[in-house]
């Protein structure tokens, strides 16, 4: 009996030592971005922009090519950690790229774009999308971890971020770090959220078009999203006070104050509970641009079945426009969640003279 207890004690001790070693290693290797970092712009846009011009923007969370209609996700109440093969990722990415090309945007804000992750079988999605969409491309890391040790099987290595592809001549791009509510040791393997801020000079003017690509917190208690939205509002208002034109867009992981909540009532708050973007928090004249006629996101608690009562839809994706940007049209492009758990949103706007 004593021998058995010694063996069990030794095994428990070994597990503890390995766990401590893993946490220590991950802590030493934790991605710790600066408050602001310059982002390299690859390629170049071929169009100039000036006040009075109209332009179109498309935002889409591509779900790293692994969240198609046939799959669920463990964080949303499902069981899948990744799809079964690289071929599925490639098929999804081909469908996503075609859908974005057909949207014919001048500027694309894309989220959950993998560079080299186990979950997407090492497929470089940023490079693939840049080849298909053309233009000036800026990529900002927001999930960089050598090994995410949960669930079983584990997520493993992740290198992912947000990508802006711009057909106009961008002057600069900066990664702006966002606050988080997560603390050590949970923080070590969590996303490091950010804003990807790109500046486009306006012909014949000292003003700029400020583009902000974003992907805010999802699986926190709501505190992180609130802090991140507050920082976004401060940045946008500071730029608008300079006379600049501002367009922020992406996956807010929140619903919007201009949408009737009864359109897509939240039935499942246990697996995901979205916050609320209140447009009045941004100041007078700011405008939310979204199209609630079609949902932009689904809960990944199960493979997609639009007729199932357990299917949960949301409107979490869209744009925020400064008072000097006029909204001409907004449309949620219905992709049927075939290749990703989000639908693209396209807007056409005019920069007021």
Language-model-derived ranges and their functions:
Residues 79-85, 113-115, 179-187, 215-223:
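Surface-exposed cleft-lining segments at the edges of enzyme active sites
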Residues 131-133, 157-173, 199-201, 281, ...:
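Conserved beta strand-loop-helix elements of the APE1-like EEP
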Residues 220-323:
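Metal-dependent phosphoesterases centered on the DNase I-like endonuclease/exonuclease/phosphatase
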Residues 325-336:
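Low-complexity, intrinsically disordered Gly/Pro/Thr-rich segments
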